[in-house]
């Protein structure tokens, strides 16, 4: 069976590199076009990335000889789908151009997330939101990932919301430096330090989970009806976003009921047996000092959400710690899992 031809936009960036790694020998998709800025256009990917490849494994052989082009749908007419790791400064217009040209977009940028006809898709959490795609007026459809920080948070909240209802959430993030892209945060700012502000992150952390966990009515996504308060911090960890979460419930669960809801949680990717679907979706660890990025980040090849330290909260009801891989589960891996879901559900033709 022939594979679907795809492009990667922003192929030289940190998320673009993850796409290229994860799509190596993928059973559904074949990268035929790599797109980046004019500075890289006309050169082979291997030439451009000699000193810029920042993943521990080598550049996949298939990508080295692909010639980079600028992100223009006229230059990628044969692709069905484009994975976008573009910076938000340019992503909005470029992604819209691809959709207008009939090429589907799965985006990691913030630009289209708040459009009520664009799903912020987390494949296990809200696959039903795909039905709003019919409300988009373009031939190509736009789907977005959430902000990488709240990907694991949203996954952790979904089974709790379904079983017990949620009134409010407080979260405190410790976000890895890779989340800022490359070259990222200056060394003298982050070494031996914590930066208690990341521009725009708290606003995204307080609103995006509500859309992810909302419901579809009349072709639009309505937000979930609870409130979130967020503190977002940059810490000197390379990969892995750790978030401390406190939750107030409508129906008061026991510790055992919460853990059971996490252990039982799965979604359509697991039912369909998608290649990148983690099993388990959530791993709960009983050790009092877990999860840790150094020890738990690669669980499920970076796709499993790891939770620990569940205990009573004297102000709300319960609190816990959640860890997810920000460039895999929170970015390229989530986008690829979304694409696998689209493929299996025949959205790609």
Swiss-Prot record:
Task: State the similarity comment.
Answer: Belongs to the aspartate-semialdehyde dehydrogenase family.
Specify which residues bind phosphate according to the UniProt entry for this protein.
113, 204
The name this protein goes by in its record: Aspartate-semialdehyde dehydrogenase
Note the coiled coil stretches, chain numbering.
none
NCBIfam families cross-referenced by the UniProt entry:
asd_EA, PRK08664.1
Key word Membrane present: no
Which pathway is this protein assigned to?
Amino-acid biosynthesis; L-lysine biosynthesis via DAP pathway; (S)-tetrahydrodipicolinate from L-aspartate: step 2/4; Amino-acid biosynthesis; L-methionine biosynthesis via de novo pathway; L-homoserine from L-aspartate: step 2/3; Amino-acid biosynthesis; L-threonine biosynthesis; L-threonine from L-aspartate: step 2/5
Q: Which UniProt keywords apply?
A: Amino-acid biosynthesis, Diaminopimelate biosynthesis, Lysine biosynthesis, Methionine biosynthesis, NADP, Oxidoreductase, Threonine biosynthesis
Kindly name one Pfam family recorded for this protein: Semialdhyde_dhC
Q: How does it assemble?
A: Homodimer.
Q: Name one GO molecular function term.
A: NADP binding
**GO process annotations (BP):** 'de novo' L-methionine biosynthetic process; diaminopimelate biosynthetic process; lysine biosynthetic process via diaminopimelate; threonine biosynthetic process
């Amino acid at each position: 069976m022939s594979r679907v031809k795809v492009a990667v936009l922003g192929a030289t960036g940190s998320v673009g590199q993850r796409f290229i790694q994860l799509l190596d020998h993928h059973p559904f998709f074949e990268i035929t076009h790599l797109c980046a800025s004019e500075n890289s256009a006309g050169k082979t990917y291997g030439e451009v990335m000699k000193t810029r490849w920042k993943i521990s494994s080598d550049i996949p052989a298939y990508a080295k000889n692909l010639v980079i082009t600028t992100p223009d749908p006229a230059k990628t007419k044969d692709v069905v789908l484009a994975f976008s790791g573009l910076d938000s400064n340019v992503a909005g217009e470029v992604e819209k151009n691809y959709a207008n040209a009939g090429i589907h977009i799965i985006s990691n940028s913030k630009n289209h997330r708040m459009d009520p006809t664009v799903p912020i898709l987390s494949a296990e959490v809200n696959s039903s939101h795909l039905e709003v795609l019919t409300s988009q007026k373009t031939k190509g459809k736009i789907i977005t990932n959430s902000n990488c920080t709240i990907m694991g948070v949203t996954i952790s909240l979904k089974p709790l919301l379904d079983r017990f209802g949620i009134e409010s959430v407080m979260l405190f993030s410790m976000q890895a430096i890779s989340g800022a892209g490359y070259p990222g945060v200056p060394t003298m700012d982050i070494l031996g330090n914590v930066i208690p502000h990341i521009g725009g992150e708290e606003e995204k952390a307080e609103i995006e989970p509500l859309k992810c966990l909302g419901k579809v009515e009349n072709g639009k996504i309505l937000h979930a009806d609870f409130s979130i308060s967020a503190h977002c911090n940059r810490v000197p960890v390379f990969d892995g976003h750790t978030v401390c979460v406190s939750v107030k419930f409508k129906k008061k669960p026991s510790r055992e009921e919460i853990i059971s809801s996490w252990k039982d949680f799965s979604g359509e990717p697991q039912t369909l047996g998608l290649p990148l679907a983690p099993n388990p979706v959530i791993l709960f660890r009983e050790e009092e000092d877990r999860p840790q990025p150094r020890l738990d980040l690669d669980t499920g090849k970076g796709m499993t959400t790891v939770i620990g330290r569940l205990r009573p909260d004297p102000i709300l009801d319960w609190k816990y710690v959640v860890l997810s891989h920000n460039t895999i589960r929170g970015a390229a891996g989530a986008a690829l899992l979304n694409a696998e879901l689209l493929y299996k559900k025949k959205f790609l033709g």
